Amino acid sequence: MIWENNDLKNILFKGFNPADYILANNIAELAGVNLNEYGDLTKKKLKNPSESVNPSLSEAFAPELDDLSKLHWLVLSRHVTTILEFGLGKSTIIFNNALIKNKINDEEFVAENLRRNNRYECHSIDNYEKWINEVKNKHDLDRVFYHKSNLVMGSFNGRACTYYDPLPNVCPDLIYLDGPDQFSPNGDIRGITTNHKDRMPMAADILVFEHFLTPGTLIVTDGRTANARFLKGNLQRDWCYCHDEEADQHYFELLEEPLGIYNLRQINFCLGDTYFHRLKQAKFF
């Protein structure tokens, strides 16, 4: 069941000031951005309408500091231990930095009290060796594990979609969906493929392992509204969902009773009482 709660974005970012946070945490420096040339730190950069559907694009999209700072904030504020990232880039650098900070601040407690076996790891998946090497060769990211996967057309409940194969065998508490692009899957489903300028990305990987995720897991999609709606229509467990239209972000939080003592400890430590307040609200939905 999906519980739509537009207040989730306010809960996730309570106390967050993007301009202050970007400066305090060196987000621009991490992303390789010159602040003197960037402009307003709090506003999104407008793109050419065809930029994201250009199959010949050979350069990464320009960094958006508002989005990157929010990702950094989420990792720290939710005491994230394990990240699964679909599509890598500047976000990978940001995740690495945030996980290093969490490792310094949290590892002693987490190692002794929680069942988290991929602690402070970001597992980043991409089907392009080029982009993996671009990040790997330019940055020393010791918390990042790179996964080169094939991208194939497939189906979920009869609906055409894409899958990465293989996937890393980890249990993330934060999933960031920013890949794949729509032009590179292999194969088709009865002639249907995402490889067309009028189509859009439609990844179904999360649906395959949804039943393994632990309560408290957060999914963030960067834009990809059609894909987010596909997830929303096919996720089977109890999720709190919010579309932040201004930021062009979608958030899904797995909002269920803890699975057991270790999951309860994780929720108490990472998310606190506000999680159980949301859970109580959802029961009246």
Question: What positions do the PLM features span?
Answer:
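Conserved SAM-binding loop of SAM-dependent methyltransferases across substrates and taxa
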Residues: 90-115
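Class I SAM-dependent methyltransferase Rossmann-like catalytic core
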Residues: 36-79, 93-97
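Conserved class I S-adenosyl-L-methionine
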Residues: 79-89
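A short helix->loop->beta-strand "cap" motif at the edges of active sites that frequently abuts
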Residues: 103-104, 118-120, 214-217
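Short SAM/SAH-binding signature in class I
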Residues: 165-179, 185
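S-adenosyl-L-methionine
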Residues: 128-170
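C-terminal substrate-binding/active-site "lid" region of AdoMet-derived donor-dependent transferases
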Residues: 180-285
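Residues in the short beta-alpha loop(s) of Rossmann-like NAD(P)-binding domains
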Residues: 89, 126-129
